[in-house]
């Protein structure tokens, strides 16, 4: 009676440990963020090119466009490893993707924990960033719009108080300051007037020369740091939800990549096993 020794081997070769669901789910997951990263880089580069070179170089460290480009490039490289690694079933790229994503997640977690544990130092760092932004207020249009939005949103002016605007060369109160905005504050510090159809951009003229009581009739006198801290304390659940929303995609990416890596390793072992037993007529 004729034997069919190679039928099980053929059956074994048709079987694969690699799940198409996991493979393509990870691929499309990375593809989505890959596209988002390219949009971020494109927007950042466009915003950068639209600025004057001198103004852009003056405040490179606080330029939102630079931050957008850096985050976009890092996300692009990370998701590129995930896309190609999952599509080509490349263990090296998948491990790189998983390790980098784990490092990003741990850094975010550590930053959040340290921010709560060392709240005073975090507050000092925020104060330093805000003061640096005030200094470069007129140098960068994006930064200027961001500060104006923040002061309107939180009903505040400056870092600690409205007099922090004296750090800016245009708003400085020194007698030798030739600027027309000397001792003033930006219009975003002004109290809203419901019946005013057109925004008065000169409403903050000379406000730093007044004391708190007099200035409070026209502008916000409280600093943005205290307002920001109070807002954070009042919206902890919202911030927790945002943090969770950022963490879940990262954890999903780490989990899927590790599952796929283990499946690829099992598939490699199966292929090696089949190759070693092909010479066996009873296999």
Swiss-Prot record:
Sequence ranges on the Cytoplasmic membrane side: 1-24, 86-96, 257-283
CDD domains referenced in this protein's UniProt entry, alphabetically: penumbra_like_LEL
Highest taxon above the source species: Eukaryota
Metal-binding in keyword set: no
Xref: Gene3D superfamilies: Tetraspanin
Extracellular side: 46-64, 118-235
Signal peptide range in chain numbering: none
Glycosylated residues, chain numbering: 172
Positions of disulphide bridges: 156-224, 157-189, 173-183, 190-203
GO cellular component terms, semicolon-separated: adherens junction; cell surface; endoplasmic reticulum lumen; plasma membrane; pore complex; tetraspanin-enriched microdomain
GO terms under biological process: pore complex assembly; protein localization to plasma membrane; protein maturation
Keywords on record: Cell junction, Cell membrane, Cytoplasm, Disulfide bond, Glycoprotein, Membrane, Transmembrane, Transmembrane helix
Subcellular locations according to the entry: Cell membrane; Cell junction, Adherens junction; Cytoplasm
Pfam families in alphabetical order: Tetraspanin (PF00335)
Transmembrane domains' residue ranges: 25-45, 65-85, 97-117, 236-256
Tissue: Predominantly expressed in erythroblasts.
Entry keyword annotation includes Aminoacyl-tRNA synthetase: no
Gene Ontology terms for molecular function: enzyme binding
Membrane topology listed for this record: Multi-pass membrane protein
Quaternary assembly: Homodimer; disulfide-linked. Interacts (via extracellular domain) with ADAM10 (via extracellular domain). Interacts (via cytoplasmic domain) with PLEKHA7 (via WW domains); the interaction is dependent on PDZD11 being bound to PLEKHA7 and facilitates the docking of ADAM10 to zonula adherens.
PANTHER family: TETRASPANIN, TETRASPANIN-33
Name of the protein in its database record: Tetraspanin-33
Organism field: Homo sapiens
Gene for this chain: TSPAN33
């Amino acid at each position: 009676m004729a034997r069919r020794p190679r039928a099980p081997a053929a059956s074994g070769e048709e079987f694969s440990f690699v799940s198409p669901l996991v493979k393509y789910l990870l691929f499309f997951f990375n593809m989505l963020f890959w596209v988002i990263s390219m949009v971020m880089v494109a927007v950042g580069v466009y915003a950068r090119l639209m600025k004057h070179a001198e103004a852009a170089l003056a405040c490179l460290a606080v330029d939102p466009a630079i931050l957008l480009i850096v985050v976009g490039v890092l996300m692009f490289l990370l998701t590129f490893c995930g896309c190609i690694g999952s599509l080509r079933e490349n263990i090296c790229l998948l491990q790189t993707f998983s390790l980098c994503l784990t490092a990003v997640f741990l850094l975010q977690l550590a930053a959040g924990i340290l921010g709560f544990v060392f709240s005073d130092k975090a507050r000092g760092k925020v104060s330093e960033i805000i003061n640096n932004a005030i200094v470069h207020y007129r140098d960068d249009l994006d930064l200027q719009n961001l500060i104006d939005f923040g002061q309107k949103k939180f009903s505040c002016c400056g870092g600690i108080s409205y007099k922090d605007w004296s750090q800016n060369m245009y708003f400085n109160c020194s007698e030798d300051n030739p600027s027309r905005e000397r001792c003033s504050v930006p219009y975003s510090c002004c109290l809203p007037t419901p019946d005013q159809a057109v925004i008065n951009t000169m409403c903050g003229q000379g406000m730093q020369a007044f004391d708190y009581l007099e200035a409070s009739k026209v502008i916000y006198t409280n600093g943005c740091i205290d307002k920001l801290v109070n807002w954070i304390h009042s919206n902890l659940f919202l911030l927790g939800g945002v943090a969770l929303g950022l963490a879940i995609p990262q954890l999903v990416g780490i989990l899927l990549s590790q599952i796929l890596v283990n499946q690829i390793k099992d598939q490699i072992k199966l292929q090696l096993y089949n190759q070693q037993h092909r010479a066996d007529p009873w296999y």
